[in-house]
Amino acid sequence: MNTQNAGKKVLVVDDDLDFLTQVQVNLEAAGFEVETAESQKQAEEYLVKNHPDVAVVDLMMEHPDAGFALSYHIKKKDPTIPVILVTAVTSETGLEFDASTDEERSWVKADAFLAKPVRIEQLLREINRFLEGK
């Protein structure tokens, strides 16, 4: 187990249970404490009493904009919580999302976008990048 990540909480939100389980197992193996939610509603209930160090959120869940809405609510509660949006929209439609500029982050309310299928190494790299110094 990676002790560097011990005590770091990651909230993972996705309605794809296979993806949710895969990410949870891999992040726990890397030493993170992982909480999961299968919907925007579940995640918002969790956030009432909890404060993750980073959130990994699927873009489209029970509503097409659920990930955007959840990201907005997370940033409204605490703008310092990094939000990584994951989506299959890019591979399905060819539309690309980006959060590399301040302007894009200001309306998207996410710190990074990752296209599904997400490689666990890529996700770990992003999480660790946001948690450096925390």
Each model region followed by its residue ranges:
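Non-catalytic signal-transmission and effector/linker regions of two-component phosphorelay proteins
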Residues: 1-9, 115, 119-134
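Two-component/phosphorelay signaling modules centered on CheY-like receiver
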Residues: 17-35
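Helix N-cap/capping motif at the beta->alpha junctions
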Residues: 36-45, 67
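Short amphipathic alpha-helix used as the core "switch/output" element in two-component signaling
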Residues: 45, 68-80, 100-102
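Active-site beta3 strand of CheY-like receiver
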Residues: 50-56
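Conserved phosphotransfer microenvironments
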Residues: 58-72
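Alpha4 helix (beta4-alpha4-beta5 surface) of REC/receiver domains from two-component response regulators
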Residues: 69, 90-114, 121, 125
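Hydrophobic/aromatic residues positioned on beta-strands within the core alpha/beta folds
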Residues: 86-87
